[in-house]
Amino acid sequence: FNIPLHSAEFEINFINVFDESSISEVIQELKYENNIKDIKIFLDKKKWIERYEIKRNFFKPSSINIFSRKPIFIWNNNSFVDKEFVIFQKSENSTFDSILSINCPRSLLDDIFYFVQNPIETSENSLVSIDYNSVEGWVFQYEQFQAKLGKNLDNYKFENLSKTMEYLYAKRKNPSIVDLRSNAGVALKYDK
């Protein structure tokens, strides 16, 4: 959105901001603020703000342009992560349709970040969520099937998953589970 709002002596423009509660918080905080230094300190503390521009005008109201970070996935249902691996809080009211959801411990987030930037998808199967649990390891949920990759992620598993997806698409096969946890090969499970 691009929402011009006026506070004290400033017009505030929110550009590509997707979270209305974040907008409200900024408006409430800056409503009566005139001090540029205090405004900068406040805006610098907000991790969801990628950058901002403050333009001083002498004959009309000054303006603040606030640009939001664009999340590439939701982490553990309470945080967003952007393309620069900046983690910022997700408010309860945030609505972000069709964004990847990842649930894993912080210590494993680095492992999955590379894959998220270069996902393996086909036109018929896009990635919906990635979960890690101590029993099965990494589980990738696609629109039409689930891929179990095990506890250790490496290029071999991603290549194997990519080739398996290409094969399944070419042969018009629709398994419910693609299991890549074994070094012996790929196991497919079809629902009856």
List where the protein language model places each region:
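Charged, solvent-exposed interaction patches on well-folded alpha/beta domains
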Residues: 1-192
